[in-house]
Amino acid sequence: MGGYGSGRSGGWPTVEDSLSLNLPRLFKTGWLKKGAWTSGILRWSIVGTGEEIASIGFEARLGEKDGYVRLHWTSTNRWSGEKRQCENRIELTTRAQPLGGRRWWFVCLHTGKLAERLHLPSGAYTFACRKAYRLAYRSQRETPRDRALSGAFALRRKLGADGGIGDYVTKPKGVH
């Protein structure tokens, strides 16, 4: 009772537990292109295992200063098994930058605000900004003690350790 990870469960969903659309990443990977029509299937998978957890079809049409992304998928209610066809049309717009150029933004379907990332928590049917769903980051929901332990485990993973907090970690090459 009261061990690591046992506090503050439940409550509002977190960003990490949601499907996320990252606009800069969509441009960087070529899924979105200014002045072009693109389409495809976006896939999400579990990082450790590679198991696919979701896929969403999309089509996008972008002009010089605005455009849209249309997403379509089937959602299954986890309790009743009922399937529902979902579709979101998300507007895109740009804003001039102080040093020149333009930056692309999603227009949130719930709040109308500009966002770089949109999220779809479990059970929701529309992608929206973090504020619309009251999403926090997982670390914000941890107790100070658990947050410190999470940081220690993350640092140990970076150093190549895979065991518990008491396992020996060798020094990385080049560290004296």
Locate each region found by the language model.
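Short Cys/His-rich "knuckle" micro-motifs
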Residues: 115-121, 139-142
